Each structure stands twice: as C-alpha cells, then as structure tokens.
Amino acid sequence: MPNLLLELRSEEIPARMQRKAAGDLKKLVTDALVEAGLSYEGAREYWTPRRLALDIHGLTARSADVREERKGPRTDANEKAIEGFLRGAGLSSVSEAQVVSDPKKGDFYVAVISKPGRATEEIVAEVMPGIIRDFPWPKSMRWGKASSKSGALRWVRPLQSIVCTFGPEHEETTVIPFEIDGITASNITYGHRFHAPEAITVRRFDDYAASLEKAKVILDAERRKDIILHDARDIAFANGLELVEDEGLLEEVSGLVEWPQVLMGSFEEDYLSIPSEIIRLTIKTNQKCFVTRKQGEDTLSNRFILVSNIQAHDGGKEIVHGNGKVVRARLSDALHFWKRDQGNLPDLETLAASAAKFGLDLQKPLDQRMAKLDALDVTFHAKLGTQGARVARIRALAKELAAITGADPALTDRAAVLAKADLRTEAVGEFPELQGLMGRKYAVLQGENASVAAAVEDHYKPQGPSDRVPEDKVAITLALADKLDTLTGFWAIDEKPTGSKDPFALRRAALGVVRILLERRVRLPLLATTRDGDLLSFFHDRLKVYLRDQGARYDLIDAVLTPDADDLLMVARRVEALTAFITSEDGKNLLAGTKRATQLLAAEEKKGTVIADGVSPALLKLDAEKELFAAISSASKDAADAVAGEDFRSAMEALSKLRGPVDRFFEEVLVNDEDAAIRANRLALLRLIREATGTVADFSKISG
C-alpha cells in the first residue's frame, strides 16, 4: 500500500516545543485523513531542531465511494417542505428522488446521494494548508514581506520548505503539490546547515531518513539522545569520571543538535568551593552542559561535557575553549554571590524592628536576610499579605503543631523564622529552584542546629508523589505548617483549584500533607487546624488518590471515609484493616450476609414497615435468632472496645464471629413473619447487624 511522507522545515524550533509539535502534527494529519474516509496501517512522527516529519505507511490510495439514502417528506407535503428537502439533498426536482411507500405513513420521497471516492493526493492537498495555517504552536511569528498582510502565515520560526510525497513502497512516488503563502510542497529537502547545505531529492521515508543521515542529520530524536548519553558516559569514563545524568537536560540538548558531537571541557578547581548544586545549575542553565564527578564519589569534578552540532576540523578545540570561557565567567558570578550571601548586608540599622519582631540575631547573615525580607514588605500574594506576615503565621501554627509531632519547641520556632530567609539571597535570586537547599547551607555555615538546618530545606517537601518525606520532627512540623498555611490561606480567599487549573500547586500541597501524616504516622485533627469543611473534603480527595496509588480499593476507602473524618492516619489504618478482613473467607461471607441484611432492612424501611425500637429477647422464638442476638451483643461490645483502642484489626476479628450466626439466621429464619411483633423484632435484629458492622465501616458501600 502507498506511503505518505511529510516534512515541514523551518528555522530552529525551540527544544521544549519539538516533541509536542511533532505529536500534534501526527494527530492533526491522521485525524483529517480518517475523517475524509482514508485508513492507514501506522504513523510515526519525527523531529529535529529544524524540521517536523511524519511517516504514514499503508495509506489507502483513495477514499471509498459513499451511498447515502436521505428520507424526505411525504409526497403530499406542502411545497416549501419539498423544496427544502430537494435543496438539502442537492436535487433539482422531485423526479430525481425515489418514492417509497409505507403502509402506515404513506408515500414519501427518498434521495439517494452517491459520492464517489476521492484520490488521496487530492485529500492531502486539501487538508494540509489548513493544518499548517492553524497549527497549535504556543508561540508563533510572521516574517517577510507577507507578514504585514492580514491572514499571513504564522509559524514558530520562519517556515522554509515543505516535502510531501506519496506512492507505493517499491515504485516511484509523486509530489502532492499544495501551496501556502508562497511555499509549494516538493520532494526537495536540505541536510545539516553547515556540513551539507545542498538540496536533497527524496522519494519516500526510507531514502529520506538515509539521505538526511548522509547529510549529517539524525532524524530520530531518541537516537540522538542515545548517542549523546552513551558518548558522554564514554568520554567521562575515559577520564576517570562518571556523568551526572540529567534526563531533562538530555531531552533539551537532543533538541538543539541534528548531528551531536560530544566534547569535554574544564574549569579551574577553585570554583569547586561553590556548592555543587549551584555549579550544576549554572552550567546546565547557561551553557546546556552536563557536569561530571569522580567515579564512586558524590563530589563534582572540574570537567563538564558539552554537545556541539558541528564536527569541527580541529576536533572541537575551539568549541571547547569558547564554552569554557563562558562557563568560567558564569561560575565567577556564582562564586561572587555565594560569598556575598555569607557577608553582612549594608543597611543593618534599618532592620532592627524586623529583627526584634522575629527574635533574629543581626550578627548572622541568614538572620539579616530574614529581617530584610520582612522590612521590604515583599508580597507573598496580594490578598494574603507579605512574606513576613506569612512567616509569622507559619511560626504560630508550627508552635501548635510541635505539641502534636513531638518536635522541640525552641528548634521549631528557630526553623520557622529562618525558613524563608534564603528568598533574599543572591543564590536563590539567580536560581529560584534552590530555595530551601541554599537556606540549609547558609544555616549550617552560621552554626544552626542540625534539625533547624534540615527543616529549612525539607519544609518544602514532599513536592510530588515520588519526592521524599521529611524525617526530622522539626522538619515534619514545619513542612505541615507551611503547607497548611498555604491551603487555609488560599481557601479563605476562594482561590481553589478548578478542573485542570491549579496555579498555586494546592493539590500538591494537600498531597504533601497526606503523605507526611500517613508516612510519618502523625495524628492531626485537620478540622481543628483548618476550620474548613470544604478544605477537609479536598484532603479526602487527595487521600483517596494516595491510597488508590498504594493499591487500596476505592469502595473500601469510601466504606470507612465519613465526611467529618479529619484524622487521616486513622482512616488509612481502617482501610488497611478492612482490606485484610474483606479478602479473608470470613470477611467475604460476612459481607454477603451483612449486605443481605441491610438490603432487606432498607427495603422494609422504604415501605414504612414497623421496626421495633430494640430487640426483645422474649420475642426471639428460634434458636438461630437467639444465637445471632447473643453473637451481636458480644461482637458489638468487643468491636466497639477495639475501635476505642484504635485496634481495627481486632475489631474486624470480633465482627468475624458473626459470620456463622448470620448465615444460620438467613437459612433458618423467615424475617417477614405473619406475626407483626415478631417481624418488627427480627427487623430490629437486622438493624443490629448494620449497626455492629457500622462501627468499622459502611458495608453497604463495599462491592461484591
């Protein structure tokens, strides 16, 4: 079957946009072809810095013929109805329509509309200009003389050429010649900008990809990534080092080169006195280079790895030299602000009031930065006040939480007042992603307690489902205070997540609270802390997501989660115990009996059947109902005692003793006895089953 090759070649596409753009191209083109009546066996997208390409194989040569019967009005309908039918069906007179008789509805017109299939070339030429013109780039531009005209083509960077060929796998292909803003599709492309700028004639994908590789363009982005990664590992190993791998940087760099050449540069060892995180970010952010470390060690080396798009005649010496100069200049700047952050601020006399407010020591650099943060009234959020006010709230909340977590109150207070201090450091000003981490380093340098220093960094954690959870009690306390302050604040001003929008990462903050409470076994009454039922419901949603990711069943979570359940650790423990119980043989059988009891009881309640207020032992006539009543009385007490002692497994074990009596009751006892008093008493007995199991879970919500 025929194949379609499409290439859109332009000036350099930003690396961050390439993968999505190629995926968008594939979806837009294949959707349009399928909508036009074509089918295909497979499609794959490709991208380089200067091109998006699409290979569609097994594409049908033409769309199928279509025959449609369109039912019209009765033959005796008014003239306007018939004229409307003819216009809609594309008929000039009723003589072109068929008349169909229906015994009940009479005679009516039917238009038979036949649409012959269309050649694939015609369909592609028709749909492609619209796809290109309406392409969903995040940012796009106009260029050239046509840019001043209304409706001028917009593309991420100036579009230079289009390749569009179609034909069988082993025969000559044809060019599908469509045109957009003066650019006509052809079978001509170009290779590497510097190494092979000559025109290349292509027929189909196989020779297209091979021709590009000869012209020093590796079309497959995953291959480019693989080449970069393995060459970088090899060159590092050859120098007694190992690559510090970075998947995000690898993805970006592979989108900057068409012919990757991996080289190694170096900088003076004096710069290794800068924290490794700053070195890594400086080299990554400014030069898109990888750092290395000594084999088997954590400390960085003074060698870095760069990826060039040019295979230089001198082996890359000039490229390495040029990159080295820039890296040294950037590291010199980094060393400067690293040292400045450890020094005194020039205006200490203006910070006395802020220092007094937070109990700060203006002889210490990090304390000075916190005082400066407060004195400048740096805004946290227009409706939530300044960073200083935020720190004061976190400090007060952390004091309350310390009594629950068991954290040292004095250390917790000290950590709270220093937690946001590094926001005024030059290091964090340059690299905001280092907030917390730099605060910890500066805290250590000025002699802070290890728990305080750890809390300054870790109070931001966890920042996602895979991030680690703080372990130190001071860090746990501060992390909870920070996240709870954020959540209660944004709930108070009605800035809640909506749909896919969550600009303040409130879902992440709530999940962080859930993970800390559960993974560090913290008992925290959230309603007493947040005083917001809607926010508690939000925590419940995050808890469900977390527990489901841990393998818990949704129905079991719903069975134990009540609207006012604000001790999430207890909810999780109930789910754990219920899961173990409900998967046992006793649990499965008790569930079946309990559901039968609750369903029967619910049906009678709905009908308004009289149910006794309590079970009367005198009205228990059969041994099975007497046995069940005794079992419920015993199991209910044991289960309630176990729940009171927060021993949910023992509560489940107590309830498991009901299995036999419940089974026997339904085998031997007719609930709807003719005697109304006995019936009401037996229904009351069923209610006791529901109440007994309800001490640990709502069994009616459990599937199965």
Curated annotation (Swiss-Prot):
Its EC number is 6.1.1.14. It catalyses: tRNA(Gly) + glycine + ATP = glycyl-tRNA(Gly) + AMP + diphosphate. It comes from the Bacteria. One of its GO terms (biological process) is arginyl-tRNA aminoacylation. One of its GO terms (molecular function) is arginine-tRNA ligase activity. Keywords: Aminoacyl-tRNA synthetase, ATP-binding, Cytoplasm, Ligase, Nucleotide-binding, Protein biosynthesis. It is found in: Cytoplasm. HAMAP family: Gly_tRNA_synth_beta. NCBIfam families: glyS (TIGR00211). Tetramer of two alpha and two beta subunits. This is Glycine--tRNA ligase beta subunit. It comes from Rhizobium etli (strain CIAT 652). The lineage of its organism: Bacteria, Pseudomonadati, Pseudomonadota, Alphaproteobacteria, Hyphomicrobiales. The gene is glyS.
